[in-house]
């Protein structure tokens, strides 16, 4: 397709997931499992392998990464634990649209910024839609 400047942009949509999935896969909200199982194993901008819902094997558990921002924020005050938090959408700049797999609200998520405190209480699919749109248009 073409972006608003008329330039060609390419996204990759991966085949639905195979049987091998991360141990947290069954704890994902049903909307994500439906996408991964029945439509795509994520979609990303071809050149960067980002700006899209990550293939399930490329999603991250936030506690598995080194985050400099942890020196600046009080993680004990956050309404989630990093080891229960999954980064599902990489914006290509080190930030993730993320969910808490222990949350009872399947529509809620947060943005995990690598340079500032997370933005809480977002509607996860609205952010994924907007970030995908931004990626395609630029």
What is each of the regions a protein language model found here?
Residues 81, 89-92, 102-138:
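A recognition module on extended beta-rich or small alphabeta surfaces enriched in W/G with H and D/E
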Residues 1-95:
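A surface-exposed partner-binding patch
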Residues 97-101:
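A short secondary-structure junction signal
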């Amino acid at each position: 397709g073409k972006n608003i400047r008329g330039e060609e942009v390419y996204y990759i949509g991966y085949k639905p997931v195979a049987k091998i999935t991360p141990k947290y896969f069954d704890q994902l909200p049903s909307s994500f499992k439906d996408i991964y199982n029945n439509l795509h194993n994520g979609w990303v901008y071809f050149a960067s392998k980002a700006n899209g819902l990550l293939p399930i094997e490329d999603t991250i558990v936030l506690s598995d990464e080194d985050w400099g921002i942890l020196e600046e924020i009080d993680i004990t005050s956050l309404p989630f634990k990093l080891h229960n938090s999954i980064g599902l959408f990489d914006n290509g700049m080190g930030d993730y649209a993320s969910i808490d797999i222990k949350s009872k609200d399947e529509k809620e998520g947060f943005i995990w910024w690598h340079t500032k405190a997370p933005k809480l209480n977002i509607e996860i699919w609205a952010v994924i839609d907007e970030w995908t749109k931004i990626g395609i248009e630029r």
